[in-house]
Amino acid sequence: PVANLIGLAFNLTDPDNLLNKGSPGITVALIERNMCGLVQDTHHNPLNAGFPNGTLKGNLLIPIENIIGGEDNAGVGWKMLMECLAAGRGVCLPATANASSKVASFGIYHYIKLREQFKMPLENMEAIQEKFNKIVYNTWIIQSGVSMTNDILDNGEHPAVISAIVKQQCTERARTVLNEAMDIHAGSSICLGYSNFLEKFYRSAPIGITVEGSNTLTRSLIVFGQGLNKSHPYVFSLLDSILDNNIDKFGEQFNKITAHSIYLLLKSYNIRNDLQQQIINFANLTNFVALKGGAIKREQMLSGDMADIFSNLYLAISVQYYHKHNNTSELLTDYIVDKLMYENQLLINKVIDNMGIEKIFLFHM
């Protein structure tokens, strides 16, 4: 409702085929705020947060030159939207999550040093230390993930899956940080007023969870499902051969997957880096899960677990990347990477147990 220039996506139809494109489909056009017929006065109220949002109404006559890219780009709006989302969701919401987590970490750090209970500072209490540990752990991961993803975007890439990982992981981890910070700040955090530095971030956390793709949808369908669709070298050729009833092609692709799995298994024995070994094990596990084909869309708990493993691997790499380029604490870096890998091993065991894959018991620990 506050925008002066609006990008409008709509389903373009051309019954008389004036554009010689048949039925063009999703198209994106730019319209100005004061365009005749545009009603732009509806304000939603997302949790009383400063998040301007509202619906657009009206019966508009949009010139064809307002289509982004002109007449030639009629019907290519879906590609535009996906490319924009691939970059955009990796910037705005992760940055917001990063900021709120840093404010909470900084504020709570000083609070537990100064606040005393039972004649001792809060920082000396193990229960507080446990919660603050989670705050630092997740804040560091968010900062590292945002930093590496920004560098990827600055290089001109549009990583759809990586941006989905960073959006989902950063907003979820920021909510964890804020929950722990609220617990430590206790009564001060639930009373509105100028001294409450957490309330506005806590209130806004569900917005980041929801917008630009619900985290539930992103985790269960997008991260692993779309990542598999974009990256696996053999499995979809295998599924196509089944649909085409092509026995020769099926045998060829199945042999490639089998050879790839054996190669990864043998390669894992020669790796001394634990993170690299877990990456190889995940790639091998993916070969087995991918054989489910379209059933992955229905088995969303399995897809979600695989997404968590994939996300943790990316975040572990980002923590090492951040340490390398910023000369940060090696002790903290090793702790976070080890903890992410431990979480992953539990998830890998869970996937193997639920699928009943006895043939890859060597990965089970």
Region spans (language model):
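Flexible, small-/acidic-enriched active-site or ligand-binding loops
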Residues: C36-L61
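Charged, glycine-rich active-site and insertion segments that engage polyanionic ligands
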Residues: E157-S189, L331-N344
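Loop-to-helix element that buttresses phosphate recognition and phosphoryl-transfer chemistry
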Residues: Y109-H110, A127-D154, E172, N179-M182, ...
